Curated annotation (Swiss-Prot):
Cellular component annotations (GO), alphabetically ordered: chloroplast; ribonucleoprotein complex; ribosome
Subunit structure, interactors included: Part of the 50S ribosomal subunit.
Lineage per the UniProt record: Eukaryota, Viridiplantae, Streptophyta, Embryophyta, Tracheophyta
Subcellular location, principal: plastid
The protein's role, per its UniProt record: Binds to 23S rRNA.
GO MF entries: mRNA binding; rRNA binding; structural constituent of ribosome
UniProt keyword annotation of Glycosyltransferase present: no
Source organism per UniProt: Pelargonium hortorum
Keyword set, alphabetical order: Chloroplast, Plastid, Ribonucleoprotein, Ribosomal protein, RNA-binding, rRNA-binding
Keyword Transcription annotated: no
Protein name: Large ribosomal subunit protein uL23cz/uL23cy
Gene name for this UniProt entry: rpl23-A
UniProt cross-references to Gene3D superfamilies, sorted A to Z: 3.30.70.330
Entry similarity comment: Belongs to the universal ribosomal protein uL23 family.
InterPro entries registered for this protein in UniProt: Nucleotide-bd_a/b_plait_sf, Ribosomal_uL23-like, Ribosomal_uL23/eL15/eS24_sf, Ribosomal_uL23_CS
GO biological processes: translation
Amino acid sequence: MDGIKYAVVTDKSLRLVSKNQYTFNVESGSTRTEIKSWVELFFGVKVIAMNSHRLPGKRRRMGHTMHYRRMIITLQPGYSIPSLINLII
C-alpha cells in the first residue's frame, strides 16, 4: 500500500460515497493499474472505473509543498469499503 496515502473526507467525497465512489490521495508516481490492484487486494472489492487529477503544489514562505494526485474510484454495485463508511458516519 505504498501508493495510497489516505482517504479524502470532504463534502464532495461524502456525496460520492452514496454513488459507491471513494476518493483517495495517492503518490503522484503511481500508475492507475497499480492503484487499482492495491485497492482490490487490500479492501477485497472490484473496481470498475477510476478518475484521477493532479493537484498542484503550493508555494510557501520557505520552499513549497509537493503536488499529489487524487483518485476517485468507482466500485461495482454490491461492493463497499466498510471502514471508510464507518469513518464517515
